[in-house]
């Protein structure tokens, strides 16, 4: 099974991806997480350090693919999750999407794709150009990380459009949305009413999720010394269980940008007023 995780930049995709990878491993699956971001920090919370990238390794080998071995580019992370970072070109030069393609090419030559039960692509930001949409060409499911805000849902809608486009050529499905560190879910639900898709999970505003990123640890590793965090791990285990159940998923019908802008803007400009005590009493008497 191959998964691709997308979402607005800074929304918490890498933290979410790492914890989902560990959750899948705890369900007995052999997991490979591939970071597809020039920052090459996707797997930081799994390994505790910034691992060398595939591009770094290829440069050292003068791009002789035959001289690269699996142990040169695949690093063992927490919970037995294997980790790869694609890396990227120097800032302001080259195409990061091309690097993603080269990463997939190398891993295929190393037969890495055949050794894992689950491969998870953690893809940068909300960039959905052809290059960074490349992981969708290999994925069975896409998951979109969002919060209860305007910008994240606007980005989610653009990603949904990419899923719809890629689904024309192979059996890709959108598994659903993951709400990350959000105190409310009303705007998420308003979006889903307009653009039907599953909500896999909504994680509350838990400070330890943010702290885990700084510590370079998954919530599962933190919970080993602080069992009070086990309830946070359950959110990720729930997502893993849903994915392993091979959900039907959807081919999303994204909203037009202007329609979505109006829908989400209206939520802020014309908020629903809470019912008064008298109105609540009237409802109870009906």
UniProtKB/Swiss-Prot annotation:
Pfam family, one: Fer4_NifH
Reactions catalysed according to its record: chlorophyllide a + oxidized 2[4Fe-4S]-[ferredoxin] + 2 ADP + 2 phosphate = protochlorophyllide a + reduced 2[4Fe-4S]-[ferredoxin] + 2 ATP + 2 H2O
SUPFAM superfamilies in the record: P-loop containing nucleoside triphosphate hydrolases
Cofactor binding description: Binds 1 [4Fe-4S] cluster per dimer.
Pathway, per record: Porphyrin-containing compound metabolism; chlorophyll biosynthesis (light-independent)
Cofactor requirements of the protein: [4Fe-4S] cluster
GO molecular function list: 4 iron, 4 sulfur cluster binding; ATP binding; metal ion binding; oxidoreductase activity, acting on iron-sulfur proteins as donors; oxidoreductase activity, acting on the CH-CH group of donors, iron-sulfur protein as acceptor
Keywords: 4Fe-4S, ATP-binding, Chlorophyll biosynthesis, Iron, Iron-sulfur, Magnesium, Metal-binding, Nucleotide-binding, Oxidoreductase, Photosynthesis
Enzyme class: oxidoreductase
EC number: 1.3.7.7
Binding site for ATP: 10-15, 39, 180-181
Binding locations of Mg(2+): 14
UniProt: [4Fe-4S] cluster binding residues: 95, 129
Gene3D superfamilies: P-loop containing nucleotide triphosphate hydrolases
InterPro entries referenced in this protein's UniProt entry, alphabetically: NifH/chlL_CS (IPR030655), NifH/frxC (IPR000392), P-loop_NTPase (IPR027417), Protochlorophyllide_ATP-bd (IPR005971)
PANTHER family per record: LIGHT-INDEPENDENT PROTOCHLOROPHYLLIDE REDUCTASE IRON-SULFUR ATP-BINDING PROTEIN
Free-text function comment from the UniProt entry: Component of the dark-operative protochlorophyllide reductase (DPOR) that uses Mg-ATP and reduced ferredoxin to reduce ring D of protochlorophyllide (Pchlide) to form chlorophyllide a (Chlide). This reaction is light-independent. The L component serves as a unique electron donor to the NB-component of the complex, and binds Mg-ATP.
Family per similarity comment: Belongs to the NifH/BchL/ChlL family.
Subunit structure: Homodimer. Protochlorophyllide reductase is composed of three subunits; ChlL, ChlN and ChlB.
The protein's name in its UniProt record: Light-independent protochlorophyllide reductase iron-sulfur ATP-binding protein
Gene that this sequence comes from: chlL
């Amino acid at each position: 099974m191959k998964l691709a995780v997308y979402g607005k930049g800074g929304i918490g995709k890498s933290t979410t991806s790492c914890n989902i990878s560990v959750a899948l491993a705890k369900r007995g699956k052999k997991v490979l997480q591939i970071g597809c971001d020039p920052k090459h920090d996707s797997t930081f919370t799994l390994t505790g350090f910034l691992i060398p990238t595939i591009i770094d390794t290829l440069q050292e080998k003068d791009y002789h693919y035959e001289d690269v071995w699996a142990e040169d580019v695949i690093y063992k992370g927490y919970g037995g999750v294997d980790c790869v970072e694609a890396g990227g070109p120097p800032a302001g030069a080259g195409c990061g999407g091309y690097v993603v393609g080269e990463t997939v090419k190398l891993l295929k030559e190393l037969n890495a794709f055949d050794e894992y039960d689950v491969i998870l692509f953690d893809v940068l930001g909300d960039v959905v150009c052809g290059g960074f949409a490349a992981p969708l060409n290999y994925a069975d499911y896409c998951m979109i990380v969002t919060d209860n805000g305007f910008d994240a849902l606007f980005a989610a809608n653009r990603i949904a459009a990419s899923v719809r486009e890629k689904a024309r050529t192979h059996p890709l499905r959108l598994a659903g949305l993951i709400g990350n560190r959000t105190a409310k879910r009303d705007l998420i639900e308003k979006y889903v009413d307009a653009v039907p898709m599953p909500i896999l999970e909504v994680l509350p505003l838990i400070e330890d999720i943010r702290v885990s990123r700084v510590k370079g640890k998954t919530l599962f590793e933190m919970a080993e010394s602080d069992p009070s965090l086990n309830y946070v791990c359950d959110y990720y285990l729930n997502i893993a269980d849903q994915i392993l159940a091979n959900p039907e998923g959807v081919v999303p019908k994204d909203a037009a940008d202007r329609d979505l802008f109006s829908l989400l803007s209206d939520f802020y400009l014309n908020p629903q007023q809470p019912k008064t005590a008298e109105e609540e009493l009237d409802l109870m008497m009906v």
